[in-house]
Amino acid sequence: MKIVRKDKYLIFNHNGFKVVLSQLGASIVEISYNDDVLTLTPINYEDLNRRDIYYGKTIGPVTNRIKDGLIKIDDKEYQLLCNEPGVSNHSGHLGLSNKLFVATIQDNRVIFTHLQKINNVNISYGIMYTFNESNEIRVDYIVRASEPFMINLTNHTFFTLGESSIDNLSLEIHADKYIESDKDTLLPKEVKSIIDCLDFNKEKLIVKDINDSYLQDHKSKGYDHSFILKDNKVILESTKYKLEIESDFSNVHIYSDNYEDKVKVKTSELLKNRGIAIEPTDDLLNRPILNKDEVYQRYIIYKITSRK
């Protein structure tokens, strides 16, 4: 395992497994294996500076959508910028996705840290990426706050697993419940039982039901849904590779790259449905409040194996 620092951080092992990290958003810029690019990665890295680009970035302090961008904690209110009509998505202007982190290399780890002040609340973030020879990436999140604040982090990597579209990607999620969102604003609404088009309890091609009327009668026109997990694993497979994601988050949000995006990426000339974002999260209906003197700790492990 070796870590090389240039303008970004290149990590590679003896198996041909490579990862590129960036201080911007403490992000995963690219994962490759056997020279196949396994993530949705812009050809021009400068595109990652766009505020509406979340590829591989850390999302927080609050992931997903908040009505009117308003956070209420006890008798205090915190206003986030609404970057969608009537909604703050991924924390708006306060989002970690466009914050520059401080990076430190330590053995087989890259540790990103950032201090943020929101009104009277001081928040410290530690995001640690650990690598090994088994083609695993472990992400540990550690957050502290000087006053109670809503914290719900995730990583927004889009996975392609060497494919140019989601057509040959299959997904397995063990879940009997999901969080239904408003079909117009996409705000989380209520817990409901899994329906057929959202049932991935047995491995299924993502595109099998993507044109189902339930999904198409929805602002996203595809998958943009949170599943309540029965266990701690999600599996994504292509013709060449298998990705296993383990975490201690209770939910996972699946987004199938539904909107046309003119950012040119390495793996596809398509404008949408080029990859799948798998975002482990806490409960989106009852987001956790981090109290003073408490520590927010979560982890995600990505393991990639070749099917050749």
Model-based region annotation:
Residues 1-308:
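An exposed, glycine/acidic-rich loop-and-rim segment of catalytic or binding clefts
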